[in-house]
């Protein structure tokens, strides 16, 4: 396909959190009121954001996906509840879109983070849908952007089966502690691996010949950290399946894995005043959860004495073997406000003043643009594999509402899908 055919591929329809209704507070009884006002008001959060799943629960929408709890006892959310994933069968069983949900990380918000502060933040997180599966809806509707099953909304991925991975470990699916830490479970890696193993055993995933890995923000980071691991796991499982089916020596079957991370390429940067805040927060999170052991294997080998570098893709981008289409803002809001800690925007931003022309903060903002371009270069320049698509908005990730995506057709990327 040409550039025009790629317009929707680089647009992620991200759903902010995985809030769903609890089993003992079914949303079905509220369908009548939803039909009139979607029950979306100030009380929405108290009702587990049920209106988010109106179509799935009440309308029998084709966009509905079923929640599948993992039977692996090691795959646990922060609070110890079972990991899970959403599965929606697509029209073409040979195609699967995997989407890893974002939602930040488990870290101490202080400028000088401590492990105690990180654990405290994890404990607070464990009481929400980003740290527990207890409130996740048994069905969930995905009807926007690249997750939609409607061809007019999603001409590229509409016929793919969808495997949606809700986020409940706070470490971008990297936590790897066999026991508990202050009563918390850091089992992101176990959730990650158990999800793919279970899906290949119990859904049509085992028949897939093409798998696209995507995710936004912390989910996009997870794609960059884990794409090669997932590709190896799927290839190994496929080969084992071929042997069991007697295909040994006859070529067997293969699976093509492609990566499409959105807004997950975060840089190792201090604040605009030179304080090492963001990198220190990530190091504390990784130390508490033993996430270092789950990071990119090639990077860990390259920086054996400095595993903390492998938290940041800029240090290992050229080592990523999976074909990758990188989607990233040149002025990512998360980096502007939480990494650089700027309190202004280059242009009009909701809730933030415009940076003064010629000021230090404005120059830092434009320096971020060049730092991203430099960091992406090793990934982009690899012959025959990846490409990138950058945007100049301050959104942390791309979304599709009622916008016309055809305006996004021109980009600096060659087809990888």
Task: Give, region by region, the residue ranges found by the protein language model.
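Secreted, short cysteine-rich peptides and small extracellular cysteine-rich domains stabilized by multiple disulfide
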Residues: 23-59
